[in-house]
Amino acid sequence: GADRVLVLDNSQIGPIFGRGVGQALAEAVRGANPYAVLFASTADGRDLASRLAARLELGLTGDAIDLEIDAEERLVQLKPALGGNVIAPILSKTLPNLVTLRPGLLTPATPEPGATATVDQLPAAPFDGRDVRLLKEEFQEDQVGLVLANAPVVLGVGMGFGGVENLAKIQEIARSIGASIAITRDVAHAGW
């Protein structure tokens, strides 16, 4: 488990990972000098990892599917290549290693009884230069189904489904069997 946890309260910065969060994380990484910094391959994780890599002038391996330690105790990052037909081993030329990992890839470690971690607060201040800002925030409360990663059943909708007029049917079926609905990129771009 973790021996030390760094917490960044971004309530003063805002809900998105802009330069203020990147700056605070970069200062923490410089101070701690870790061997590796791992991020989830989510929109926020990729954004923050790339900001950190740029600020610290480090390499970044994106969307790794596994990690190994080789005989020389180097972190080997395994990444799909050539359309997923090959798994390429990546060795960083810079330290710390920065890696984004696909969500759900790692199995949580079994906690050690009685183990504790120190919790340190990272200072955060709004970035005083130009930054990303949130223009509009919307919440959709009537979503049907479960998060795809946790869904026991997923119904897929592609362009062959016919059109937006047929979506009510698939939503009804999904509700009746407790399924989530996934759509292809073409369907999303069509605005169904």
Spans of model-derived segments:
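N-terminal glycine-rich FAD/FM-binding segment characteristic of electron-transfer flavoproteins
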Residues: 1-192
